[in-house]
């Protein structure tokens, strides 16, 4: 039986260190980090954003985390959803062409909100921890996209990037390999996003990225609470790659 890809991912996420990153990689991480923040600020004028903010505020209470380009404070989950939407809604966010994945919207929005929340509680994240987590998130999301061979039916910038966000959050949380594996499985249970919104050009397209970013946070929370997830995520008979990416 082939080794489960989620297990390979878990080992990779767990064992990778900042020191493994080349100088070129670190430089590019910083470039795309700043680029994504800039795109998120530009997206603060996005379509239906006021409506989104009004409803997102009712979904979860709290004013712990920042929305890009504003002085607004929302709960961790609400700010993640809004920031992911702002980053992707103009479709200026960076893309891995070969993977057909915009990785940073889901990954950075969830990572920023989580780090801001734990910082408010006195648990500080240093730059090296942040960058290796970001790198691993992009690595996993892009790898999933590159492996896909079939016609694009589900919205890969949302589906693949959700797993990338879990990878980044798992690293920043210093999860064990077993915990990372559980988090990936729990994320699979929540993964969503289709191409119909892309075909029709409706604003919910960008929100699909936000839904998965928020789901990544829920996956982290459930894992921390000791909740198990399915283990056969990428190799099982009901696998992600068959359902969402049509991998051969």
Question: What are these regions, as identified by a protein language model?
Answer:
Residues 1-101, 113-120:
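Generic N-terminal targeting/processing segments that precede catalytic cores or assembly contacts
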Residues 36-43, 103-128, 163-175:
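Alpha-helical support elements that line or immediately flank enzyme active sites
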Residues 99-106, 129-134, 150-162, 205-209:
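Active-site nucleophile and cofactor-binding loops and adjacent substrate-binding regions
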Residues 124-138, 177-189, 199, 231-238:
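Beta-strand segments within the central parallel beta-sheet cores of soluble alpha/beta enzyme folds
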Residues 136, 140-155, 189-217:
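Flexible, glycine-rich active-site loops centered on histidine and acidic residues
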């Amino acid at each position: 039986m082939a080794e489960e890809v989620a297990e390979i991912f878990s080992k990779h996420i767990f064992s990778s260190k900042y020191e493994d990153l080349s100088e070129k990689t670190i430089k590019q991480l910083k470039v795309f980090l700043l680029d994504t923040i800039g795109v998120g600020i530009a997206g603060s004028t996005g379509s239906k954003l006021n409506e989104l903010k009004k409803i997102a505020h009712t979904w979860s209470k709290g004013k712990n985390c920042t929305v890009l380009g504003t002085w607004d404070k929302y709960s961790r989950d609400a700010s993640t959803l809004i920031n992911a939407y702002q980053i992707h809604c103009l479709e200026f966010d960076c893309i891995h062409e070969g993977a057909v994945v915009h990785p940073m919207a889901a990954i950075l929005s969830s990572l920023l909100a989580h780090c801001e929340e734990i910082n408010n509680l006195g648990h500080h994240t240093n730059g090296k921890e942040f960058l290796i987590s970001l790198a691993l998130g992009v690595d996993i999301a892009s790898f999933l996209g590159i492996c896909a061979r079939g016609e694009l039916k589900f919205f890969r910038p949302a589906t693949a990037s959700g797993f990338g966000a879990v990878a980044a959050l798992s690293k920043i949380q210093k999860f064990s390999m077993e915990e990372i594996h559980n988090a990936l499985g729990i994320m699979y249970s929540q993964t969503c996003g289709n191409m119909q919104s892309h075909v029709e050009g409706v604003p919910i397209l960008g929100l699909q990225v936000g839904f998965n970013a928020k789901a990544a946070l829920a996956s982290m929370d459930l894992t921390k609470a000791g909740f198990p997830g399915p283990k056969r995520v990428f190799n099982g008979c009901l696998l992600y790659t068959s359902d969402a990416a049509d991998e051969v």
